[in-house]
Amino acid sequence: MSGVMTAVSNRWDPGVIRALAEARHGDAFAVLGAHRTDTGRVLRTYLPGAERVSAVLDDGQTIALEAGPEPGLFAGDLPAQGGYRLRIGWPGGEQDTADPYAFGPQLSDFDLHLISEGHHLQLADALGANVVEVDGVRGTRFAVWAPNASRVAVVGDFNSWDARRHPMRLRHQSGVWELFVPDVGPGAHYKYQLRGPHGHELPAKADPVARRAELAPGTASIVADPTPYQWSDDGWMATRARRQAHDAPMSVYEMHAGSWLREEGVDLDWDGLADRLIPYVADMGFTHVELMPVTEHPFGGSWGYQPLGLFAPTARFGTPDGFARFVDRCHREGIGVIVDWVPAHFPTDAHGLAHFDGTALYEHADPREGFHRDWNTLIYNHGRREVSGFLIASAMEFLQRYHVDGLRVDAVASMLYRDYSRNAGEWVPNIHGGRENYETIAFLRRLNALVREHTPGAVMIAEESTAFPGVTADVAHGGLGFHYKWNMGWMHDTLHYAGLDPIYRRYHHGELTFSMVYAYSERFVLPISHDEVVHGKGSLLGRMPGDDWQRFANLRAYLGFMFTHPGRKLLFMGCEFGQPTEWNHDSGLPWHLLDDPRHRGVQTLVRDVNRLYVQYPALHAHDDDPSGFAWVVGDDAGNSVVAFLRKGKRGDAPVLVVINFTPVVQHGYRIGVPQGGQWREVFNSDAGIYGGANLGNGGIVTAEQQSMHGHAHALPLLLPPLGAIVLTPPG
């Protein structure tokens, strides 16, 4: 027996023992597992906490391994050929399992090449935690990109979070560490324990490519169920490209999933949200919902705009399958789903991407490029292939795996300009000495080109607040390739105008009309978003001046203007019924206000104007074509009146829109129109059903033969105070 013990002891190098025991050894596969010797093989295992270990050979023979000089070390001789399993005696019982170190490299060289080039569009099928079967053994393959780490181990509830138990293999050419762990399946919680390039231990990291995450404040990743979701939206997907074409109506209900409706202070899960939200959105006439970011994020107060889990729907509202069911049910009711997506920056939480492998891996090393002082976040290094590939794969994950119909890309301006929110000397110029971020421009172009290629019919929308040229121009023509861009200029100008006392509006008339100067420079969405009802800005209703009747009338007129102005529509939740207070993510919307006829009237107006917008092609078919709009009255600053014609394709009836932004009734206000006969008043924001005074034109107005505003006929109109009316010609 003493000879055997001596032989076993000689199998362990003292330096190796120390490195294993201190969780510092960077090449576990060189030590652990079965290795050939002159007489057969030697099997080494390191299982801290184990009391005994045996190797069970394929023929049933059991070989007891001898304990080594450090607790948890076991070794023994095996025949030169044949497989084996480990039988491990723990204090609480016995475990029979395959040896993780008996398996060869897992990821193919092609996968590793695609990862290194930033071209792996199904990145979460390679990296992250994937339940697989290897050589007849079921388990989970873990893989993480950490090229500068000196050691990486996977830790989890399957190994008591012990970093000594499952050190990983480095695939040197790619910087990817991998390990197949037998018997680990869906639901297992895990993280990665890394040491930096100089051997220092880093905080345990969540998996950047995890498809499921632990509910906050927990920060672990979870092995996702590999069972594919069974979709039932073939009809929607087959017609999506047509539904989301440039000439189709798009009216978006922007919402925060956690605060749309709270029942007894509890968030709805995805199924509960689908039960309540989808019928509401359909009844209100919106064509799409836009969800504020649903990727996993540690701080709820960020509303999702500081995410760390870019491949995992947040656990706050249920499982990934729950999110898929929500999207599926939206599609079955004809509602598209857009999600906000954040490829600009990420938070500094220790368990996240910050200094992931002990170096600035996902972020820029220079804080003049890599730190965003406005948000105290780190900025992605879009010039690094693996990082841009990681982000593009995240976009593809939601567009392809979850059938999402579009992404609204957050904070595009902050990415495009190197001097964004920085003073002189606080930013690094590009190679030509300029402020444009060439790496981000290349990233966005590639992202949008790939989305068009691989997810036809999906739309990409930019939240871009500057005059950067060509945001929605084709990549082939030098543009960024987005489908649509938020029209922040329209939003700022018109909200400022609407917030003025009507007596002063005559001096700011240009704020109402200037948007048409550049309306066709891009393809626009008109956004009244969450950003306009937070941070002390007040609510949309609260911005309106005057007493109660004026505020509600102003709001109704403004919404009438918005829904008839060229551009797709976006309205944040609560604005559709005139929420009087700022949005608070910790509280549900004040739905009880619908007991008040004034708020119910605003809601009814939004429902009707949505249907009007969809019903009349003139209001949407030529949003991007100057032929679809013509001023009739654009210069009546004294009366704060505007009138314009919206035109559709050949055969579509034009629509006349007239808005009076003063509280003065205008009697006999004459508007030139292109044809005579009886024009029908199809919308009046002062209608009693909306909470107005029912001042209007009785539904019908006869055009008189009179040359006016370049037309041969004129309509004598009564313009309600702070009111918008819409008329259609005979026929």
Curated annotation (Swiss-Prot):
Its EC number is 2.4.1.18. The keyword Transcription regulation does not apply. It comes from the Bacteria. GO terms for molecular function: 1,4-alpha-glucan branching enzyme activity; cation binding; hydrolase activity, hydrolyzing O-glycosyl compounds. The active site is at D410, E463. Keywords: Carbohydrate metabolism, Glycogen biosynthesis, Glycogen metabolism, Glycosyltransferase, Transferase. GO terms for biological process: glycogen biosynthetic process. GO terms for cellular component: cytosol. Pathway: Glycan biosynthesis; glycogen biosynthesis. Pfam families: Alpha-amylase, Alpha-amylase_C, CBM_48, GlgB_N. The keyword Membrane does not apply. Gene3D superfamilies: Glycosidases, Golgi alpha-mannosidase II, Immunoglobulins. It catalyses: Transfers a segment of a (1->4)-alpha-D-glucan chain to a primary hydroxy group in a similar glucan chain. Belongs to the glycosyl hydrolase 13 family. GlgB subfamily. Catalyzes the formation of the alpha-1,6-glucosidic linkages in glycogen by scission of a 1,4-alpha-linked oligosaccharide from growing alpha-1,4-glucan chains and the subsequent attachment of the oligosaccharide to the alpha-1,6 position. NCBIfam families: branching_enzym, PRK05402.1, PRK12313.1. Monomer. This is 1,4-alpha-glucan branching enzyme GlgB 2. It comes from Xanthomonas oryzae pv. oryzae (strain MAFF 311018). The gene is glgB2.
